[in-house]
């Protein structure tokens, strides 16, 4: 992502005959966000996930497709910046299976810029590796390391 553009020059210096690039807002076309709503993910973790999603929308002009799942896809919500503050409606509470999210993305033809997965990793049923970059944002210390994607440990109790 580039913070500057020549298509809209910086007007501050134009009267001096100096042409500098203007700032442009960072834009990501679409982000898919999988939220693990299984029984092992508590309200504190879901609250932290919501805060992180709000921060993403505040920083980037994007569309978030939020996929709530436990052992299956339970619900999907779509958000944009104008939807802040976010009101997530997580549904779930059963066991955990990551594979249905991958199938849902394929079945619905979503090709997001990246996939962000909020989870406690208390599951070993991983989907096929997606075509887009994947970041596992993990609450707590549980679970095995995913076979692909980047891993980010979120601070518990934050």
Short names for language-model regions:
Residues 95-96:
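Conserved blade-ending motifs and adjacent loop-strand segments that build the rim/top face
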Residues 65, 122-158:
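VWA/integrin I-like adhesion module and closely mimicked acidic/polar interface patches used
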Residues 1-32, 41-44:
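Acidic, polar low-complexity linker/tail segments
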Residues 25-83, 88-91, 100-119, 123, ...:
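Von Willebrand factor
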Residues 8, 84, 89, 111, ...:
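Intrinsic-disorder/low-complexity coil detector
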